[in-house]
Curated annotation (Swiss-Prot):
This is Probable lysophospholipase BODYGUARD 3. A lipid is attached at C56 (N-palmitoyl cysteine). Keywords: Cell membrane, Cell wall, Cell wall biogenesis/degradation, Hydrolase, Lipoprotein, Membrane, Palmitate, Secreted, Signal. One of its GO terms (molecular function) is hydrolase activity. It comes from the Eukaryota. Residues 1-55 form the signal peptide. The active site is at H224, S297 (nucleophile), D446 (charge relay system), H474 (charge relay system).
């Protein structure tokens, strides 16, 4: 009993210590990010002779016209996109729609501001309770005043010109040959290989594995996760699914902005862009009629979107560590809610610190990319010396470092945070309109995406089968047990084909 009390006290003390240290650290990071904002504006002008807009806010006076550009509304202190007029073509791809752009890109309150808002809201609730009886006496007059205030609020709309300039630059017709890389991005042959290919349409990089000597019976699409690449599959599962013994045609893509795929500097990396590039580069190009999907982490969101769009073609869904955080009913800011789940602004565990820095701080995350991604060849060389060119370490580093900050930043916000409220719809479509098998794998020691996310998916899709792999994390659920995982996949495909 005494031991249990000591452990409980230690847990509480550890939690409070984590909260206190996190508060101090992230308050400092708020200041550092603001300083880096000014530094990068000067550096961009120095190296590129152009002021590059960012998502830092600078409120301006309300106006009532946008002259056919981008309009932002102001509601309870939160700015959000109200309309885009006219919708512009994205170099042959479909038009940007409102729901494609997550407000978490430009509405990320500082920690002090966030805590202040919560405190003020709580005080307001208590004040309302105390003064309720008094307000009832003068209710009629107050209602009249409120109506007038609402009418005044509705008559004016706040435009944040910083965000307008950022989005205006992003939605212009894309020229994938322009601004191949920024000064803070890597310009090596590997990272810019897409720009030197003969493919004028700039499709995604796709690694294929075709059966030897036999006609492929079925197709399988592999989608990697965030800051990764197709090597996550081709260096692990593909060799275990030998071309000499397999009857499946395998496709592993590098997502837009990652690996060897195009990294357009003026893309918003929305869900629609990612999905349509997969459709163009795999489904249309290789004439795929029906297929299985295997997706990891962020790739699960794209897989569910594809399933919703091509329900009749999906033979099975295999999801690994799906980042599904159900948004409570009545939540006014679903994307903000998901962002705080993904990046809780905590220093412990370390993976939470990394996720928080990548998600909350545009300029700190750009600095990380400058130090790591731009110089990935140096880090790969050092890792090769230390590990004696370990193949697994090499491809993991390649996938982790070969992307641009623009791609990672927008993909994180527009896909993981921005689709929080959409996933319910996708899951309902899979549950009600698709008959394919749904299998979910999750590492028992995964600290990046909790196991609860997989069980949340099962609650939405009761027929889904969840398998928790004990003592494995977000990566080692595949890496290190690829032979076993390949056998599990073959069994899933065999069962789904019956």
């Amino acid at each position: 009993m005494a031991v249990m009390k000591i452990k409980g006290a230690a847990t509480v003390a550890g939690t409070w210590l984590n909260e206190a240290v996190s508060f101090v650290v992230f308050c400092i990071l708020d200041i550092v990010d603001s300083f880096l904002c000014l530094l990068y504006k000067a550096a961009d002008y120095l190296f590129e002779a152009e002021w590059k807009p960012c998502y830092c806010l600078s409120d301006k006076e309300p106006i009532t016209t946008t002259r056919g550009k981008i309009l932002l509304s102001h509601n309870n202190g939160e700015s959000k996109i109200l309309t885009l007029s006219p919708l512009q073509e994205l170099g042959g791809r479909s038009k940007i729609e409102l729901e494609d752009i997550s407000e978490t890109l430009y509405t990320r309150p500082s920690l002090i501001s966030d805590i202040s808002t919560i405190s003020v809201n709580e005080l307001n609730k208590r004040f309302v309770k105390v003064t309720r009886s008094e307000s009832e006496c003068s209710g009629h007059n107050e209602k009249t005043k409120n109506k007038r205030r609402r009418s005044l609020t509705k008559s004016s709309l706040t435009v944040n010109f910083t965000v307008v300039e950022m989005l205006r630059g992003k939605i212009r017709p894309q020229n994938l040959n322009h601004d191949i890389s920024r000064w803070s991005d890597c310009d090596c042959g590997f990272c810019t290989s897409w720009a030197s290919t003969s493919d004028k349409n700039h499709s995604l990089f796709v690694k294929t594995q075709i059966p030897n000597g036999v006609t492929a019976k079925e197709d399988v699409l592999f989608i990697h996760g965030f800051i990764s690449s197709s090597a996550f599959w081709t260096e692990t599962v593909f060799p275990s699914l030998s071309a000499s013994s397999s009857t499946h045609r395998l496709f592993a893509v590098d997502l837009l902005g990652f690996g060897k795929s195009p990294k357009p500097a003026d893309s918003l990396y929305t869900l629609r862009e990612h999905v349509e590039m997969i459709e163009k580069s795999v489904l249309h190009k290789y004439n795929v009629k029906s297929f299985h999907i295997v997706a990891h982490s962020l790739g699960c969101i794209l897989a569910l979107s594809l399933a919703a769009r091509h329900g009749g073609l999906i033979k099975s869904l295999t999801l690994l560590a799906p980042p599904y955080y159900p948004v409570p009913k009545g939540e006014k800011k679903p994307r903000q809610y998901v962002m705080k789940k993904v990046a809780p602004r905590k220093v412990w565990p370390p993976i939470a610190l990394g996720a928080s820095m990548a998600c909350w701080y545009e300029h700190i995350s750009r600095t990380i990319c400058l130090l790591i991604c731009k110089h990935h060849r140096v880090w790969q060389f050092i890792a090769g010396v230390l590990t004696r060119n370990n193949r697994t370490v090499n491809f993991l580093i390649e996938g982790f470092m070969c992307h641009t900050h623009n791609a990672a930043w927008h993909t994180l916000h527009n896909i993981i945070c921005g689709t929080g409220s959409k996933l319910d719809t996708y899951l309902d479509i899979v549950r009600d309109k698709l008959k394919c098998n749904v299998t979910i794998f999750h590492g028992g020691d995964d600290e990046l995406i909790p196991v609860e996310c997989s069980y949340n998916v099962k609650q939405r899709i009761p027929r889904a089968r969840v398998k928790v792999i004990e003592h494995k994390d977000h990566i080692t659920m595949v890496v290190g047990r690829q032979d076993e995982f390949a056998r599990e996949l073959q069994e899933i495909w065999k069962t789904s084909s019956c």
